[in-house]
Amino acid sequence: MQKFTVHKGLVAPMDRENVDTDAIIPKQFLKSIRKTGFGPNLFDAWRYLDAGFPGQDPASRKPNPDFVLNQPRYAGASILLARKNFGCGSSREHAPWALDQYGFRAIIAPSYADIFFNNSFKNGLLPIVLPEAQIAQLFDEVNAFPGYTLTIDLERQVIVKPQGKELPFEVQAFRKYCLLNGFDDIGLTLRQSDKIKAFEAERLAKKPWLNHTIPG
């Protein structure tokens, strides 16, 4: 998992409440047995004028010119500004996968659905919670100033606005540790590989029959 320490990026505003996971990555794209390739279908039903299907060449699609991520001023955005209850709906880990693979490193919103919130941390995507008043002000500034960027300093737990003003945010210590070091669940487990190997060796020494395979 990619480390998250300090990130400066262009902000794209998703000015809708209750954006659910089916809007983030529609159900027809969940058939893939791979963990990659979801970025082109992020917000698929809003992003394109034609219906999408798995394996389709994105270059053959008809982009919706009115959708925020298709507007030239937000090309290359890596921070998504959203409204309350972002990521509600069904429990699909594909939602943070799609956001990450599109290029987003962080989301800033007043609130999130719990499962989406947890899945985001586990996949290297930082979901930041700010008060609605601060979110509203950020929307005003992003809309008013093309090329609006923010700097997110996870170590210090602050968002730095273009003029230098800092907005503090909270993050649970263990989640912060994992993001700073790029540890997902597998990475955390592998850090204990010596202890795991020692346990297996001790177990086989005490119960050697466990090392025998059953003839086919």
From Swiss-Prot:
What name appears for this protein in its UniProt entry? 3-isopropylmalate dehydratase small subunit
Q: Which NCBIfam families match?
A: leuD, PRK01641.1
GO MF terms here are:
3-isopropylmalate dehydratase activity
Keyword Repressor among UniProt keywords: no
Organism from which the protein derives: Polaromonas sp. (strain JS666 / ATCC BAA-500)
What HAMAP family is this protein classified in? LeuD_type1
**Subunit (UniProt):** Heterodimer of LeuC and LeuD.
Q: Which gene encodes it?
A: leuD
Answer whether the UniProt record assigns the keyword Amino-acid biosynthesis to this protein. Answer: yes
Family that this chain belongs to: Belongs to the LeuD family. LeuD type 1 subfamily.
**Annotated pathway:** Amino-acid biosynthesis; L-leucine biosynthesis; L-leucine from 3-methyl-2-oxobutanoate: step 2/4
